[in-house]
Amino acid sequence: MKTQKKSSKNAVTAGVLIALYFVTYAVIGAISMPVPVLFLLMPMLVALFAAPTYHMLLAKTKSATAIVIAAILPSILLVATGHIPIAPLVAVPAGIIAMFIAKGGNYIDFKKNTISHMFFSLNLFGGFLPIWVMREAFFESVIKGGLDQSFCNTVRAWTPIWMLPVMIIGTFIFSLIGSYFTKKILNKKLESAGVL
């Protein structure tokens, strides 16, 4: 009975934290989307501001399933709203890699959880990859989605092929910064959850 109650409590906690992550993603996305520079910074901004939620998700639930669900959710939204449907092809591997890294530290090793978050934060790149691999189709879908030609022209000009690795490295860096501040801000909560 106790195990069942604990399992139910973990499921509720995971649901709340996944929802909080999704809201963080959605709010940053809504603010970023019309502005080219913010649009390209979006994976980095989400990595930074969602870090506390991610670390609490690991600490409170120790759930592999929760990590994968959180990773995939934004890509499902992208596909559901008519974006080019390759987003899950990046989100799923990112979630699985993040899950194995966190699991390797039994979800309580803060260093491994930090590395896990770095790879987890690549989950959004499925929405950006078409800028390079399906360039014309991407800009057509953006126009159909209601953004203007000037947005497309600016993003096109700012995204030579070398910008992709720059964005990935930037996301890793912002993820590290987010994890650093998480440890500073939520230190007591993480300690009480047994995260070292």
PLM ranges: what are they?
Residues 18-26, 73-81, 120-129:
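Aromatic-anchored segments of alpha-helical transmembrane domains
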Residues 1-3, 8, 186-196:
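Short, charged juxtamembrane terminal tails flanking transmembrane helices
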Residues 39, 114-187:
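Membrane-embedded alpha-helical hairpins and interfacial helices in multi-pass inner-membrane proteins
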Residues 11-16, 44-45, 64-72, 85-89, ...:
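Hydrophobic alpha-helical transmembrane segments
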Residues 2-65, 69:
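Hydrophobic transmembrane alpha-helices
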Residues 30-34, 38, 74-102:
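Interfacial aromatic-anchored transmembrane helix boundaries in multi-pass membrane proteins
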Residues 23, 91-129, 179:
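Short helix-perturbing small/polar motifs within transmembrane alpha-helices
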Residues 28-36, 61, 65, 85, ...:
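Membrane-interfacial segments
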